[in-house]
From Swiss-Prot:
GO terms for cellular component: cytoplasm. Belongs to the MurCDEF family. This is UDP-N-acetylmuramoylalanine--D-glutamate ligase. SUPFAM superfamilies: MurCD N-terminal domain, MurD-like peptide ligases, catalytic domain, MurD-like peptide ligases, peptide-binding domain.
Length: 438
């Protein structure tokens, strides 16, 4: 446990995570100072009187006088003010680093471009099914510092690349990078390898590394070692087995669960289940209760969620597909009896959309492209694409065209912030319109 007594601590970024950092230091007898580039950041009204605050910009004077800077994942380490502080030898950490220095129970750590919230939640459910007192959070749900509890027997953390950049004391009992595809390229000017390097920090001092056999970018930098356990579609220690028209989860040659017993559907969810099982096994959770959790878990909202099935048409909300890799995962192995009506669009965060093209062949695909990067997406297959300003216009356009056997899929491959508050609002709007139009 670290000692922060007498330290000049500055926290950048408020919100729930920033407040959890403030509470963390106050509980240890240290009064931090807080700054946020927003004029009225969320949580400002909950800040105790004694805490000095500076809003609307960063305060370089405070930063250069600090002994310790706790930076929100929302601010890039490359920001000139942080860069100058780092050059001056000032320590910069994030809330996850503070958490790792204090946590007394083992940590299962999960990152990846896609699937991480589902896998994090699943491992948490597996622990609960085993009667283990578990804390689940990080980049999903509660900030990590709010989970700290002497009674906790296991922590399961979802970690973003931004959080990992400021974390060096993570010693996970089991850690995984589920996949690495282009995302946040606006934060990583040196491209995919720079983004991957941030993700790879999760393996440092991990007891077991769970890697994706189908994605070489998830391997440790020196390649697989004795700490590595793998999962994949057709290969890996944990893989899928197809026999007589049925699909099984298989571990080292042994069939452990028929996927028809699971409530989750889709090949990407079956591989998520394999990854979760590998992590749970590595953390020492009993296999039987982990498999039971797999049969009861219904999935998370906005992640390939069937919001309406009516007149033979399935309306699926995959609004959490905020990058190309996530939409690829939804389309890979997708079975549609009739026509796929695919809604794409939003803010593509400078990504290359071309990997989607291979899934959009054939006569039974229609594209409806909207938002900031709609024109670029429509160019993937212009002869079957319609361009509208908004998602609502796209849905009103496609609704009269759907036939029994068709699927309407919102898997936008883009962030939502050009037209929505967040992906949840976009997904809720899709669900509302599906119920109205379907």
């Amino acid at each position: 446990m670290a000692d922060y007594q007498g330290k000049n601590v500055v926290i950048i970024g408020l919100g729930l995570t920033g407040l959890s950092c403030v509470d963390f230091f106050l509980a240890r007898g240290v009064t931090p100072r807080v700054m946020d580039t927003r004029m009225t950041p969320p949580g400002l009204d909950k800040l105790p009187e004694a805490v000095e605050r500076h809003t609307g910009s960063l305060n370089d004077e405070w930063l250069m006088a600090a002994d310790l800077i706790v930076a929100s994942p929302g601010i890039a380490l490359a920001h000139p003010s942080l860069s100058a502080a780092a050059d001056a030898g000032i320590e910069i950490v994030g809330d996850i680093e503070l958490f790792c220095r204090e946590a007394q129970a083992p940590i299962v750590a999960i990152t990846g471009s896609n699937g991480k919230s589902t896998v994090t939640t699943l491992v948490g459910e597996m622990a609960k099914a085993a009667g283990v007192n578990v804390g689940v959070g990080g980049n999903i749900g509660l900030p990590a510092l709010m989970l700290l509890d002497d009674e906790c027997e296991l922590y399961v953390l979802e970690l973003s690349s931004f959080q990992l950049e400021t974390t060096s004391s993570l010693q996970a009992v089991a850690a995984t990078i589920l996949n690495v595809t282009e995302d946040h390229m606006d934060r990583y000017p040196f491209g995919l390898q720079q983004y991957r390097a941030a993700k790879l920090r999760i393996y440092e001092n991990a007891k077991v590394c769970v890697v994706n056999a189908d994605d070489a970018l998830t391997m440790p930098i020196r390649g697989a070692d004795e700490r590595c356990v793998s999962f994949g579609v057709n290969m890996g220690d944990y893989h899928l087995n197809h026999q007589q028209g049925e699909t099984w989860l298989r571990v080292k040659g042994e069939k452990v669960l028929n996927v028809k017993e699971m409530k989750l559907s889709g090949q990407h969810n079956y591989t998520n289940a394999l990854a979760a099982l590998a992590l749970a096994d590595a953390a020492g959770l009993p296999r039987a209760s982990s498999l039971k959790a797999l049969t009861t878990f219904t999935g998370l909202p906005h992640r390939f969620e069937v919001v309406l099935e009516h007149n033979g048409v399935r309306w699926i909300n995959d609004s959490k597909a905020t990058n190309v890799g996530s939409t690829e995962a939804a389309l890979n192995g997708l079975h549609v009896d009739g026509t796929l009506h695919l809604l794409l669009g939003g803010d593509g965060k400078s990504a290359d959309f071309s990997p989607l093209a291979r899934y959009l062949n054939g006569d039974n695909v229609r594209l409806y492209c909207f938002g900031r990067d709609g024109v670029q997406l429509a160019a993937l297959r212009p002869e079957v694409a319609e361009k509208t300003e908004t998602m609502e216009q796209a849905m009103r356009l496609l609704a009269p065209r759907v036939q029994p056997g068709d699927m309407v899929l919102l898997s936008p491959a883009c962030a939502s912030l050009d037209q929505f508050k967040n992906f949840e609002q976009r997904g809720n709007e899709f669900a509302r319109l599906a119920k109205e139009l379907g």
